[in-house]
Design a protein with these regions (language model features):
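C-terminal, charged and often intrinsically disordered regions of DNA end-processing helicases
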Residues: 1-81
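Conserved phosphate/pyrophosphate-binding and hydrolysis machinery centered on Walker-type P-loop NTPases
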Residues: 81, 131, 282
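Hydrophobic (often cysteine-bearing) scaffold residues that line and stabilize catalytic clefts
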Residues: 80, 84, 88, 134-137, ...
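Metal-dependent nuclease catalytic regions and adjoining charged, substrate-binding loops involved
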Residues: 1-15, 19, 212-217, 227-315
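Anion-coordinating catalytic cores for phosphoryl-, nucleotidyl-, and glycosidic chemistry
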Residues: 55-56, 171-174, 185, 287-290
C-alpha cells in the first residue's frame, strides 16, 4: 500500500507496528476493587455518572462540579462549533465505514443526512439555519475530513488489520450501577489478540482541532481506565491527534496510568458524597466562571471571565 509521508508517520510512530504489552489477568478486577472499596460506604447521588467533563470540572472548581452534578446548567443547544464537531465525527465514520471510497464533500453531505435522521436536537438546529450558514459548516467539515484523510492511512482499506471503530460509547458500572464511569471514543484501532487475550492491542485516539490543553491527557487516561474495566484489558496507547498539523500527544498505558485515573474517579465520588451531606464546595475562580451556572451568585466568581474568554475566542 502506497502512503504519503504523514500517513506513514502516523501508522509507524503513532499506531505502531511493534510488540504490544501484556497485562496481568487480574488488572481489571484490581481496578474495580480499588474504586469500589474506596467509595462503597459513601452517600452517593444515585446513580452517580462520571465522565471527563465532570472530572475536569472538579479539577477546576468544586462549585462548578456541584452545579453539573445538580443539573443546573441550561438544556444543551447546538451552536456552530458543536454542530461542526458532530458532523466532523460523523463524516469520518462515513469515510471509514463506506464500502467504496467517498470524496470529502459526499461524506459531509451523508453525515448531515444521517445526523438529522438520528439526532432530534441537531435536526432542529440544522433546519433553523440559512442555506449559506449550512454551506459554511459543511465546508468546515470537508476541510477537517481532508485533514483526517491526509494524516491517517486509509482505514477503510485497513479494516481487517486495524478494526477501526468510531464514536464508540463505553461505560463501566461499579457497585451494581450506583457509580457509572463513561466516555465516547472518537477512534479506536486494533483487534483483540485471540491467542493472548491480555495483550494490549488497541489504541484510543481523540481527534482535536485547535490547541492542546492539559486536561486532554487526563481525558485519555480516563478512556484507558474505562476500556480496561469494560474489556478487561486496556489500550496500549492513548493519544490526542491534532488535525491541523497532523501532530499528536500520546501516552503509553501502564498500570500506574490506570490507577491514577481510578484515583480521580474516587476523588470525584468522595467530593460528590461530602457535598451531598452538606459540605460547602471549595470555590476557585478562573476562566470556567464564564460558563458556570452559578457565576451570578457565586462569591468567588471572576467577574471578567466572560469578557476574557470572548477575547481569546476571537483572537
Amino acid at each position: 500500500m502506497q502512503l504519503t509521508d504523514p500517513q506513514r508517520r502516523t501508522l509507524q510512530q503513532l499506531i505502531g507496528t511493534g510488540d504490544r504489552p501484556v497485562f496481568p489477568a487480574d488488572l481489571a478486577q484490581r481496578l474495580r476493587d480499588r474504586i469500589e472499596e474506596a467509595v462503597r460506604g459513601l452517600d452517593l447521588p444515585e446513580p452517580l455518572w462520571l465522565g471527563k467533563e465532570k472530572l475536569n470540572d472538579l479539577g477546576r472548581c468544586e462549585g462548578t462540579f456541584l452545579s453539573r452534578l445538580s443539573g443546573e446548567a441550561p438544556p444543551f443547544e447546538h451552536g456552530r462549533a458543536s454542530a461542526t464537531g458532530v458532523l466532523q465525527h460523523r463524516a469520518i465514520e462515513v469515510v471509514v465505514g463506506a464500502r467504496e471510497p467517498l470524496d470529502p464533500h459526499t461524506a459531509a453531505q451523508l453525515a448531515v443526512t444521517r445526523t438529522v435522521d438520528k439526532e432530534e436536537r441537531f435536526a432542529e438546529f440544522w433546519q433553523g439555519l440559512s442555506e449559506p450558514d449550512r454551506d459554511d459548516i459543511l465546508m468546515e467539515v470537508v476541510r477537517r475530513t481532508i485533514l483526517f484523510e491526509g494524516s491517517f492511512p486509509p482505514l477503510r482499506e485497513l479494516r481487517r488489520e486495524l478494526s477501526p471503530a468510531t464514536e464508540l460509547p463505553i461505560r463501566a458500572e461499579l457497585l451494581g450501577g450506583a457509580l457509572v464511569v463513561s466516555g465516547k471514543l472518537d477512534l479506536l484501532l486494533g483487534s483483540p489478540d485471540r491467542l493472548e487475550p491480555m495483550r494490549a492491542t488497541r489504541i484510543a485516539i481523540d481527534l482535536k482541532t485547535g490547541s492542546a490543553y492539559p486536561q486532554y491527557a487526563e481525558d485519555n487516561r480516563l478512556y484507558a481506565l474505562v476500556l480496561a474495566l469494560r474489556f478487561g484489558v486496556p489500550p496500549f496507547r492513548v493519544a490526542s491527534f491534532f488535525l491541523e498539523g497532523g501532530t499528536w500527544q500520546s501516552e503509553d498505558v501502564a498500570e500506574d496510568t490506570l490507577f491514577h485515573a481510578a484515583d480521580r474517579v474516587i476523588e470525584a465520588a468522595r467530593s460528590a458524597a461530602s457535598m451531598r451531606r452538606g459540605r460547602d464546595p471549595s470555590l476557585t475562580p478562573g476562566p470556567w466562571c464564564a460558563w458556570c451556572p452559578r457565576a451570578q451568585v457565586c462569591p468567588a466568581a471572576d467577574p471578567d471571565a466572560s469578557a476574557r474568554v470572548a477575547v481569546e475566542a476571537s483572537a
